[in-house]
Amino acid sequence: KKKKKLIVLETDLRTPEDKAWFQDNLIDKVKTPWILSKFEKQAEETHQKLAMINQSLNNAKASIGNLSFATPVMKTDFGADLYTVSDVEASEVLSSMRETFKNKALMLDFWATWCGPCLKDFPSSKKIHAEVKDEPVEFIYLCSSNGSTEEEWKQRIAEFQLDGTHLYVDEKIEAELMTMFDSRGGFPTYAFINKSGAYKPGAVSRMAALDRGQFVNLIHGK
């Protein structure tokens, strides 16, 4: 029963900082040598990840931003532009994104910091983004404020070193945007708009399922 309780607690941890605190406290209570060795290794890996996150956030610069509907937060050294979005109509957010990234396709990723499937898909998103760097497409990640703090949002972006445009969006605006795309599936939700401005329902269900050839065809409306 005690073991089960510890597992539940660890899976509920929100950020690497929370996980490091949990592991540090757990190590003091472990007496079995091989288990202790395992936890010490995990704790070391977590602290290394936490150090990387903090370094990335500390190295981030102030951003003047280029989105009329959003407040700029920072620009990281790994290519992420962070903004907050509130007190604006969802329709304005969408139209302004189209105007800002004119002649580009938009890959919209609706997510939350507590969403396991969202986080699991991030490495695939980062991979396909790198593969289409030479293509006219903007990756825009919209994190809901529902259950996600701004600090958790920043830490998740730094944890995955996820470049692109990142929006921390008021939950009501995010819900309205998702409704505009007829989404009923919760997080993650993906919406794709090709470079001609046409929304393609169901074009992307999982980032892990995309390959470069498929995605390039989507971008150009083929």
Residue ranges and their predicted role:
Residues 1-104:
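Oxidative protein folding and maturation machinery
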Residues 59-61, 66-67, 72, 122, ...:
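C-terminal structured domains
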Residues 74, 130-174, 181-184:
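Conserved segment of the thioredoxin-like fold in thiol-based oxidoreductases
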Residues 91, 95-98, 126-129, 150, ...:
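Extracytoplasmic/secreted envelope proteins and their assembly/folding machinery
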Residues 102, 110-127, 144, 148:
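Conserved redox-active cysteine motifs that mediate thiol-disulfide chemistry
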Residues 104-105, 122-143, 158, 213, ...:
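Conserved helix-turn-beta segment immediately C-terminal to the redox Cys motif
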Residues 105-106, 188:
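Alpha/beta-hydrolase fold active-site loops
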Residues 162, 169-220:
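Thiol/disulfide oxidoreductase modules built on the thioredoxin-like
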